[in-house]
Amino acid sequence: MTSGDGRSRKRACGVAVDMGASHLRFVLADADGTILEEVRDRVNGEAGPRGVIDQIRTGINSVLRPRADECLRGIAIGVPGGVDPESGKVVDANNVPGWREVDMGRELEDAFHAPVYLDNDANMAAIGESWRGIAKGIDNFVFIALGTGIGAGIFIDGRIRRGHSGFAGELFRMNVDWTRWNDNFTDTGYLEAQISGMALASEGRKLFTQGNGSPTGSLTDTRDARYLFEALRRGDGVARELVERAFVVLGVGVANVVSVLDPELIVFNGGIVQGAPELLLETVETVVQRIHPKPPRIKLSTLGDRAQIFGGLRTLLEPGEQNAIRPKSTHGRPN
C-alpha cells in the first residue's frame, strides 16, 4: 500500500482477511492502517476450498463496495495452516476439510488485480502484536494462539521467522510425553490433542456424559469448549481438573520453546485463553519457572481478535520488511 505522492497514498487502501477454522473477518483500511470497513462471516468448511475461496472473494467485495475498488493496493490473508514460502500455496489447513496445496493467492490476485500476501494465522497475529500490541518494541518473543487448534508465531531479532519450509511455530505437533511416541496423532499432533478447543471439548464431553459434573451449554459442537469453561466458572471440580491438566501440558510445551529460543516474552491469545485467562497464566508460569532459572514474561494479548487483522495491515504497509509471501506464479508483478 505504499505509494509515492501524498494524494495517491491517501486514496490507497488494502484488505486484511482473518480466516479461522470457523470464522472469516474482512477489514478495509487506508494507507495509515486506519480501519474503514469491516465484515464478518462463518467459514463453510464443508464446501471445500472452492467454496471458501468464493466466500473470501464475496467478503472482500463487501468491504470494497462502499468505496471505489480503484483504491485497492493489496490483500493480506492469515490462514489456519502452513503456507509454502516458495510457491505461496496453502500447504495444509488441518482444521478445514480438504485444504492441501491450495493456490488461493493466485486465484485472488487474478480476481482483484492486486498483490495477495498469505501467511499462517499465528504469524500474522505475531506481526500484529509486534506492531500495535503488547510485543511492540520487543525483538524476541513467541506468540501462541490457542483456539480450535494451536500454533505460534516466532519473532527473533525483530523479524518473523518461518523456517526452511514455512512451518516454524507449528506447536500442535510437539510431543511432551515420552511414553506416547508410538501413538498416531495423524494431522492433529500431540499438543493439539491435549490443549486445543477441539481436544478440551471432546474430553469434557466424555466426562460429563458419564455423569461426572454438570455442564451448561451445548455438548453437540465438537469444536466448542465454552460449556467446559462455564462449568469451571461455576466451581465444577471435574472441569477444573481437566483444564488444569491441559494447562500443565501446555506449560511443559512452552518450557521447551523457551529452552530453544530464549524469548523475552510469551504472548497468549485465542478462545481457550479467554475461557480461563488467570488459571492459564498461573499454571503455565508455575511450570516454566520450575524448569527455567530466568523465565520470560508471560502475558495475554492486548489486541484480542484484532491481532491477526493488524498483522495483515502491517504486511500490506511493509511487505518487504515482513518478507511477505506471494503466489509464485505472480512474483515479479509490480506492487
Where are these regions (language model features)?
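Active-site glycine-centered loops adjacent to acidic/histidine catalytic or metal-binding residues
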Residues: 121, 147, 312
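A charged helix-plus-loop insertion that forms the helical arch/lid used to bind
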Residues: 89-99
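Adenylate-forming
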Residues: 125-131, 154, 173-175
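General beta-strand structural signal in soluble alpha/beta enzymes
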Residues: 116-120
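Structural signature of FAD isoalloxazine-binding scaffolds in flavoprotein oxidoreductases
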Residues: 167-171
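Short beta-strand scaffold segments in enzyme catalytic cores
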Residues: 24-28, 150-155
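ATP-binding/phosphotransfer module of carbohydrate and carboxylate kinases, centering on a glycine-rich
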Residues: 1-74, 84-87, 106, 110-114, ...
